[in-house]
Amino acid sequence: MNKSVKKKIKDEINVIVTNLALSNNIKLDNININIQKPPKSDLGDISILMFEIGKTLKLPIEIISEEIIKNLKTKYEIKAVGPYLNIKISRKEYINNTIQMVNTQKDTYGTSKYLDNKKIILEFSSPNTNKPLHVGHLRNDVIGESLSRILKAVGAKITKINLINDRGVHICKSMLAYKKFGNGITPEKAFKKGDHLIGDFYVKYNKYSQENENAEKEIQDLLLLWEQKDVSTIELWKKLNKWAIEGIKETYEITNTSFDKIYLESEIFKIGKNVVLEGLEKGFCYKREDGAICIDLPSDSDEKADTKVKQKVLIRSNGTSIYLTQDLGNIAVRTKEFNFEEMIYVVGSEQIQHFKSLFFVAEKLGLSKNKKLIHLSHGMVNLVDGKMKSREGNVIDADNLISNLIELIIPEMTQKIENKESAKKNALNIALGAIHYYLLKSAIHKDIVFNKKESLSFTGNSGPYIQYVGARINSILEKYKALSIPVMEKIDFELLKHEKEWEIIKIISELEENIINAAKDLNPSILTSYSYSLAKHFSTYYQEVKVIDTNNINLTAARIEFLKAILQTIKNCMYLLNIPYMLKM
């Protein structure tokens, strides 16, 4: 049931209850009218739990229910059942209004002004330039991309940020391996994307370090040369980073992931030191005898965290900074550049402690004044035999996973589509639908094991199933269009009397509420569940009714408009979940 109908009924009951209170000399501050969905559709469309109202008025719920029924019985079919008031609304008006609304608003159906231009930054992806994106990045990226679309749909002004980690020890590992084993190889010569080539050298370094005790010192020496801006070292660093970033951007393009601003860590990492030095001047930090600049953090080892502290070094005694310090600088930069109200970091659960410390220090230094900082922690994506480790080469690369799924799909596509390019494009879209839906349908905080077979199912809770239902509805609409039946001047939606039609209309009308809930909870899985429910209901409906009946063009016209509304709702959900819509499958 859509929000406007719920609000209307809620307002009407509020007036009745307020008048009842006045007539009984009862003072009311606030009335909590709890609207619920009945457990069974035959009970009604809306249920009101009367306990809270009875408690507020200090009157028997039977008396309150009787008063509400007396005042609303001309508008609704309403019945008291125990502690509930069950209400059935006018189907004719509701069906007509819902279908007209969806088919008029089209792509904007389900949007709202819930967050009303709130300025929100979403930081996600943040890859290292020493390896290609893996399936863990795919989860991070689709969460970030989907949430950005969901938050925009409820009225927020979104800035999507990607901080690429292009410096440090981990980057030097690939550089050292390339110096030793590269022999002038390039992505073109290797017939590889640049990020994959760099990833190969990251794995080579790991093997090299296991056999050479001096490897760690070589890395530190190389890092020192980089910091001293040694010409040949900087040239190598720029060349390898360019290859890696070009490859990573190709993957973003394939997966329909985009950013409003991309930062390179090498360009901004020093800003955090200035922020800390300002904090030192203001007395928020202190300097140790060895010259290190520190701040005291609440200890996580005791329940009374505010009574005990632990020392956190922000700038080391040698003048170098830690990642937390660099992130403080990032907050300062983004405040100046975007003047945001809220910043959401989409980062894996292994970084929970880092963000606890970051947010505490940011507050102490006054960086987060009038701002909300959120760490949206997501679980890991594992291999069947455990956690991925890229330094060992035991990892599902994002590109390889997509290619692998395409290979599984392409034989079926080539049977249906003669044009090879079209078949490959369709296979890619199905692969993306499979991956994105699978990575979004679980609770964000949970670790998951990616199951290729399950992700590609055309019958279960999967992306390809949602895509198939969308394509199926489109084919029905195309079939109807080909019949060249004259356009009806007025559609009689009162003809839609099948119980499944009513159930589907109620689901369609709840899109806005589901989008708002997904935005509130920062949880795209609310929309995967919603999409799956709508798709399943349509499939059952289509098995039970004949949509196109040339002997009954009035009913057919009503059902065609009904299907248009279903398809539009599914398409809007697919966009929010970054799942490609397909005309044919």
Curated annotation (Swiss-Prot):
Subcellular location(s) of the protein: Cytoplasm
Catalytic class of the enzyme: ligase
NCBIfam families: argS
Record motif 'HIGH' region, residues: 127-137
Family recorded in the similarity comment: Belongs to the class-I aminoacyl-tRNA synthetase family.
GO annotation, biological process: arginyl-tRNA aminoacylation
Transmembrane domains' residue ranges: none
EC number: 6.1.1.19
UniProtKB keywords: Aminoacyl-tRNA synthetase, ATP-binding, Cytoplasm, Ligase, Nucleotide-binding, Protein biosynthesis
Name of this chain's protein: Arginine--tRNA ligase
